[in-house]
């Protein structure tokens, strides 16, 4: 959620910044509601002061043994009723303002380019595209040759967009997850296994709700409204809520977490023919990294997360590139995002395996996640950051395709061999 004071005090600057992401925003109605709200709050404060003064007078009269005139009690009752009336009238105003503010995306950082994917910029490329002296196979064919993935039975069990890992497919998948987990533990991140079913407030704090509430798998009969529960689309949705409604100590920051979960996605639209196999599905495994930091530390934290994700891909020996996303290609909650994209030879494309993002204080405002400065005792919002570390459903196809030999065998990345038990499949 954006800072209302910033919108009020520098409306044009906020409008201009948001134009990088969305169409022009008209703040007229919001500012009008804000004026009403502030006037009502002022009236309530004046009446509360009058009530306090009347209560003090009653106490003084009683302490001196005097008799309190009934008019005092009548006045206090009238003031209390008026306060209650004004506070009731504040509720719909606040509701309208919250609805408006919750629909706004985060303000992009100044160094983020406007527009969509067409303005994404490649920062650097790691390694060379693999060159084959034979006709390379795609990951679906290689999976079939080695009996790694059962797409047919996955569809039978759950429908399109699902698959079954089997044999060395399951072993490779588990090896990847173990490799990622081991590296994050070495780096001092705390391991979290969160619930997979979350409440509405989790989606709202993350910035995914209310806009995207129909793009998740809902659970049970409470499918609508704030009583709904849903299956997490990413562990970020859980991790950003760990400290919701909390005030942290300054010396507790930064807090560094990572979580393993399957991710469940209701994808809009149809898949491209080239995105068959594991490239896009309704369920996939992912390790998610997350940090809570002080505002002045979040830029360095983003660099750390990017570096960690890149190190994992480098460790696997995969060719990839790092791209900085333009504003409209960043998710609504994020001020800045970098994507790590691995090369998929059969598609002649790079596909994202990690997004590393800085939400600044956008999610913290929604979830009331704050910290107290040790020196000033001032309470401020934390900054929140996340990065995939990594998503396996793109990594495994990249390994199969980039590491294949002419005979269809697959070279197992060295970092995975202690779990796989083989150098080659």
From Swiss-Prot:
It comes from Clostridium acetobutylicum (strain ATCC 824 / DSM 792 / JCM 1419 / IAM 19013 / LMG 5710 / NBRC 13948 / NRRL B-527 / VKM B-1787 / 2291 / W). Keywords: Aminoacyl-tRNA synthetase, ATP-binding, Cytoplasm, Ligase, Nucleotide-binding, Protein biosynthesis. Disulfide bonds: none annotated. This is Serine--tRNA ligase 2. Consists of two distinct domains, a catalytic core and a N-terminal extension that is involved in tRNA binding. Gene3D superfamilies: Bira Bifunctional Protein, Domain 2, Serine-tRNA synthetase, tRNA binding domain. The gene is serS2. Catalyzes the attachment of serine to tRNA(Ser). Is also able to aminoacylate tRNA(Sec) with serine, to form the misacylated tRNA L-seryl-tRNA(Sec), which will be further converted into selenocysteinyl-tRNA(Sec). It catalyses: tRNA(Ser) + L-serine + ATP = L-seryl-tRNA(Ser) + AMP + diphosphate + H(+); tRNA(Sec) + L-serine + ATP = L-seryl-tRNA(Sec) + AMP + diphosphate + H(+).
């Amino acid at each position: 959620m954006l800072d209302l004071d910033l919108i009020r005090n520098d409306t044009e600057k906020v409008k201009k910044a948001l134009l990088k992401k969305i169409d022009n925003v008209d703040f007229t109605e919001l500012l009008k509601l804000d004026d009403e709200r502030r006037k009502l709050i002022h009236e309530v404060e004046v009446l509360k002061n009058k009530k306090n003064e009347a209560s003090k007078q009653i106490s003084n009269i009683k302490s001196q043994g005097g008799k309190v005139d009934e008019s005092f009690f009548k006045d206090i009752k009238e003031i209390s009723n008026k306060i209650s009336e004004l506070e009731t009238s504040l509720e719909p105003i606040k509701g309208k303002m919250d609805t408006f503010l919750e629909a706004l995306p985060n303000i992009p950082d100044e160094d983020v380019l406007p527009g969509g994917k067409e303005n994404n910029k490649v920062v650097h490329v790691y390694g060379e595209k693999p060159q084959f002296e034979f006709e390379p196979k795609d990951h679906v064919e290689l999976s079939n040759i080695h009996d790694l993935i059962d797409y047919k039975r996955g569809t039978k069990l759950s429908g399109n967009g699902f698959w079954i890992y089997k044999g060395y497919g399951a072993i490779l998948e588990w090896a990847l997850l173990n490799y990622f987990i081991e590296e994050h533990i070495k780096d001092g991140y705390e391991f979290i296994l969160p619930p997979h079913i979350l409440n509405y407030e989790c989606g709202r704090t993350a910035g995914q709700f209310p806009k995207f509430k129909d793009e998740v798998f809902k659970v049970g009969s409470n499918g609508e409204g704030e009583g709904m529960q849903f299956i997490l689309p990413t562990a970020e949705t859980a991790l950003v809520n760990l400290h919701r409604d909390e005030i942290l100590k300054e010396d507790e920051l930064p807090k560094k977490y990572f979580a393993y979960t399957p991710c469940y996605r209701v994808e809009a639209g149809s898949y491209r023919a080239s995105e068959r196999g594991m490239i896009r599905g309704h369920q996939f495994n992912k390790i998610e990294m997350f940090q809570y930091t002080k505002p002045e530390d979040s830029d360095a934290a983003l660099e750390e997360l990017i570096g960690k994700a890149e190190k994992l891909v480098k460790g696997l020996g995969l060719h990839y590139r790092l791209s900085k996303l333009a504003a409209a290609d960043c998710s609504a909650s994020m001020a800045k995002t970098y994507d790590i994209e691995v090369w998929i030879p059969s598609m002649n494309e790079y596909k994202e395996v990690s997004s590393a993002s800085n939400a600044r204080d956008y999610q913290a405002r929604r979830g009331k996640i704050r910290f107290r400065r040790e020196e000033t005792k001032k309470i401020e919002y934390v900054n929140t950051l996340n990065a995939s570390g990594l998503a396996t459903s793109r990594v495994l196809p990249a390994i199969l395709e980039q590491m294949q030999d002419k005979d269809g065998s697959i070279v197992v990345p060295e970092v995975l061999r202690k779990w796989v038990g083989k150098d080659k499949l």
